[in-house]
Amino acid sequence: MLPDKGWLVEARRVPSPHYDCRPDDEKPSLLVVHNISLPPGEFGGPWIDALFTGTIDPDAHPFFAEIAHLRVSAHCLIRRDGEIVQYVPFDKRAWHAGVSNYQGRERCNDFSIGIELEGTDTLAYTDAQYQQLAAVTRTLIASYPAIADNMTGHCNIAPDRKTDPGPAFDWPRFRALVALSSHKEMT
């Protein structure tokens, strides 16, 4: 899963125009976990790719008319079946966090990597998603070691606006998988 110029080799690439450069010399030091489903509560289909590439049809679903104007992206999406889709290289600034603050530092997009899980706040995430998220996180930590101590949810950096990844996300399970994966690599 080694990155190639900021792209995961195993990921399906769907380049987003919604990104820019990080501030000078800024390296990612935070992982932000999100969730997304489009239309809300529905999985599969082309709509997440369309949102992150600015091509979502506002007439395809009533909810899309509310979000078609957004210019947003994440670095990656992990679908329910474990497929990884990457939209923005890790060394660039994806537009996933919005108005945000982590441990007193604002503008989390400047120093974070955003990974979306296809899901909702209240529906359990899949085994494949946890396995892939742990694998991607391990890869990120190898390149950006500060992430090991800085993994959080969108709800924690924008608590007045966001609730994802929600109570359905099992943080202890995720952290154990990251630790287990890291331990396996060292032995």
From Swiss-Prot:
Keywords: Cell wall biogenesis/degradation, Cytoplasm, Hydrolase, Metal-binding, Zinc
Gene3D superfamilies xrefs: Peptidoglycan recognition protein-like
UniProt cofactor note: Zn(2+) is required for amidase activity.
Enzyme Commission number, as recorded: 3.5.1.28
SMART domains linked to this entry: Ami_2
Database matches in CDD domains: PGRP (cd06583)
InterPro entries, sorted: Amidase/PGRP_sf, Amidase_domain, NAMLAA_amidase_2
Organism superkingdom: Bacteria
Record's subcellular location: Cytoplasm
Enzyme class, broadest EC rank: hydrolase
Cofactor(s) needed: Zn(2+)
Positions of the N-acetylmuramoyl-L-alanine amidase domain: 29-167
Active site per the UniProt annotation: 116
Site (Transition state stabilizer): 162
GO MF entries: metal ion binding; N-acetylmuramoyl-L-alanine amidase activity
One example of a Gene Ontology biological process annotation: peptidoglycan catabolic process
Binding site for Zn(2+): 34, 154, 164
Function: Involved in cell wall peptidoglycan recycling. Specifically cleaves the amide bond between the lactyl group of N-acetylmuramic acid and the alpha-amino group of the L-alanine in degradation products containing an anhydro N-acetylmuramyl moiety.
PANTHER family: 1,6-ANHYDRO-N-ACETYLMURAMYL-L-ALANINE AMIDASE AMPD (PTHR30417:SF4), N-ACETYLMURAMOYL-L-ALANINE AMIDASE AMID (PTHR30417)
Protein name according to UniProt: 1,6-anhydro-N-acetylmuramyl-L-alanine amidase AmpD
Organism: Salmonella typhimurium (strain SL1344)
